[in-house]
From Swiss-Prot:
Alphabetized UniProt keyword annotations: ATP-binding, Fatty acid metabolism, Ligase, Lipid metabolism, Mitochondrion, Nucleotide-binding, Transit peptide
Effect upon mutating R354L: Impairs malonyl-CoA synthase activity
Involvement in disease: Combined malonic and methylmalonic aciduria: A metabolic disease characterized by malonic and methylmalonic aciduria, with urinary excretion of much larger amounts of methylmalonic acid than malonic acid, in the presence of normal malonyl-CoA decarboxylase activity. Clinical features include coma, ketoacidosis, hypoglycemia, failure to thrive, microcephaly, dystonia, axial hypotonia and/or developmental delay, and neurologic manifestations including seizures, psychiatric disease and/or cognitive decline.
GO biological process: fatty acid biosynthetic process; fatty acid metabolic process; long-chain fatty-acyl-CoA biosynthetic process; malonate catabolic process
MF terms (GO), sorted A to Z: acid-thiol ligase activity; ATP binding; CoA-ligase activity; malonyl-CoA synthetase activity; very long-chain fatty acid-CoA ligase activity
Subcellular location: Mitochondrion
Family label: Belongs to the ATP-dependent AMP-binding enzyme family.
Highest taxon of source: Eukaryota
EC main group: ligase
Location, primary (coarse class): mitochondrion
The name this protein goes by in its record: Malonate--CoA ligase ACSF3, mitochondrial
Protein source organism: Homo sapiens (Human)
Length: 576
């Protein structure tokens, strides 16, 4: 075991003896301050609540501690710079897009809030995406300005220069700038409800990523639903280890705590060692909420197996986790039962499973009460969410489907004769997105004629809860909590000079959920190793989309219509 981990045990051992693991109290917050910002608008974004939490600690990162007042003041200052640069009238960008690339720290929150304060739509970029993918998002979103932390200026400068988009560097004042007393009403009162708030890019069955545009009402609906369901309070402290370009990291793990005045401890990179140290540390603020994808839990357990080998250390770890941490959540990918069971043995926690996607935020969640959680189930609808399980029925005129079950937070009604019958999940409610950016036809086709969003996921209702059976489309691969479009990967791989044909499939994997596998046909006389393919693909694909397996074949089988039967490919190459 590492020396400093042992030291942590010794220090916590003393704490254990003295406090007997009494639940930690939140540090004193002093006087709370309020400001009359957008009181009349029930869809106002999270920053309008910040001054009410005043000098409470909002974030802890590698730069230090940041209060709500500090984040607000720095965001306001940055929003004014954005408006000056863009020449917006009356301090309102009127939904112009603001792309930003920041580290997992306070700079991200400041950039997000500043985008909203200036009346813009926030477009978060992912720091591990290659330049070509960043260029695609900035171009497709038609961003008016790009914000970037100092460490990403070199990466983004040639991209924005090529696109002709102004670049606004974020200075160190983002972290340490003096706090100015904000005006009584610092941002223009505006109708937030239907105003565009954020575009998150998600992979789809059509290939290139689509921009999912959510309104402030959409985001508020997700946040308030989760705050209610998971009993968030100002005394919570969450450890944040997730990427900040999808709903799990942005909404669930960041906006929820900031909504209630809680504290978010942000790690710049996921590190199993540092996560365990944070769990076991007696320093304040003390972690009591954690959210991750199944792959992260697997990595944590692998570290545990290597370093927590002594029975007394294992007992101590379990005692601390049981007494100090109130909620642990898994999402973004199916949670393998062995992972759930082993995590419970290690920490005493039965992971709460939930279901959502970029277009709908969160729709289903397991119960907060651990005793009634069913392993493998994603629970029941969140407040405000309506769901249906349906199957196609083209003979019906009013709507082209048959309803198996329909429910909301109050309960689910099953159609007689359709008990425990699988079907596609449809979702409706205030959390459902406004549109795919600049894609009206794809937006239209994503909904039924009567206005329900088609998730493309196969589900079943049984034992009083909902169970996800998998994607209706084999062209969506969920790996390590990320959603990868097989078609987009194929599109890029076909540009390789040695490849003539390719099929990308998702193969079941205990660690990653699915792994990206490329079935490839090469040009005559060419050769290609997996290592060579990975090195080439890293220049055009996100790290998680680079194929982790290469299968070379003389010909990829297709049907009479020229289509590839990917389910048959998976069965052929991976029969287990």
């Amino acid at each position: 075991m590492l020396p400093h981990v042992v030291l942590t045990f010794r220090r916590l051992g003393c704490a254990l003896a003295s406090c007997r693991l009494a639940p930690a109290r939140h540090r004193g917050s002093g006087l709370l301050h309020t400001a009359p910002v957008a009181r009349s608008d029930r869809s106002a974004p999270v920053f309008t609540r910040a001054l009410a939490f005043g000098d409470r600690i909002a974030l802890v990162d590698q730069h230090g501690r940041h209060t709500y007042r500090e984040l607000y003041s720095r965001s306001l200052r940055l929003s004014q710079e954005i408006c000056r640069l863009c020449g917006c009238v009356g301090g309102d960008l009127r939904e112009e897009r603001v792309s930003f690339l920041c580290a997992n720290d306070a700079s991200y929150v400041v950039a997000q809030w500043a985008s909203w304060m200036s009346g813009g739509v926030a477009v978060p970029l992912y720091r591990k995406h290659p330049a070509a993918q960043l260029e695609y998002v900035i171009c497709d979103s038609q961003s008016s300005v790009v914000l970037a932390s100092q460490e990403y200026l070199e990466l983004l400068s040639p991209v924005v220069r090529k696109l002709g988009v102004p670049l606004l560097p974020l200075t160190p004042a983002i972290y340490t700038g003096a706090v100015e007393e904000p005006a009584e009403v610092p941002v223009p009162e505006q109708g937030w409800r239907n105003k565009g708030a954020m575009i998150i890019y998600t992979s789809g069955t059509t290939g290139r990523p689509k921009g999912v545009l959510s309104t402030h009402q959409n985001i508020r609906a997700v946040v308030t639903g989760l705050v209610h369901k998971w009993a968030w309070t100002k005394d919570d402290v969450i450890l944040h280890v997730l990427p900040l370009h999808h709903v799990h990291g942005v909404v669930n793990a960041l906006l929820c705590p900031l909504w209630v005045g809680a504290t978010c401890v942000m790690m710049p990179e996921f590190s199993p060692q540092q996560v365990w140290e944070k769990f076991l540390s007696s320093e304040t603020p003390r972690i009591n909420v954690f959210m991750a994808v199944p792959t992260i839990y697997t990595k944590l357990m692998e570290y545990y197996d290597r370093h927590f080998t002594q029975p007394h250390a294992q007992d101590f770890l379990r005692a601390v986790c049981e007494e100090k941490i109130r909620l642990m959540v898994s999402g973004s990918a199916a949670l393998p039962l062995p992972v759930l069971e082993k995590w419970k043995n290690i920490t005493g926690h039965t992971l709460l499973e939930r279901y959502g996607m970029t277009e709908i935020g969160m729709a289903l969640s397991g119960p907060l009460t651990t005793a009634v959680r069913l392993p493998g189930s994603v629970g029941t609808p969140l407040p405000g969410v309506q769901v249906r399980i349906v199957s196609e029925n083209p003979q019906r005129e009013a709507c082209s489907y048959t309803i198996h079950a329909e429910g909301d937070e109050r309960g689910t009604k099953v159609t007689p004769g359709f008990e425990e019958k699988e079907g596609e999940l449809l979702v409706r409610g205030p959390s459902v997105f406004r549109e795919y950016w600049n894609k009206p036809e794809e937006t239209k086709s994503a909904f039924t004629l009567d206005g329900w969003f088609k998730t493309g996921d196969t589900v079943v209702f049984k034992d009083g809860q909902y169970w996800i059976r998998g994607r209706t489309s084999v062209d969506i691969i969920k790996t390590g909590g990320y959603k990868v479009s097989a078609l987009e990967v194929e599109w890029h791989l076909l540009a390789h000079p040695s490849i003539t044909d390719v099929a990308v499939i998702g193969v079941p994997d205990m660690t990653w959920g699915q792994r990206v596998t490329a079935v490839v046909t090469l040009r005559e006389g060419h050769s290609l190793s997996h290592r060579e393919l990975k090195e080439w693909a890293r220049n055009v694909l996100a790290p998680y989309a680079v194929p982790s397996e290469l299968v070379l074949v003389e010909e990829i089988p297709r049907n009479q219509m020229g289509k590839i039967d990917k389910k048959a490919l998976i069965r052929h190459f991976h029969p287990s």
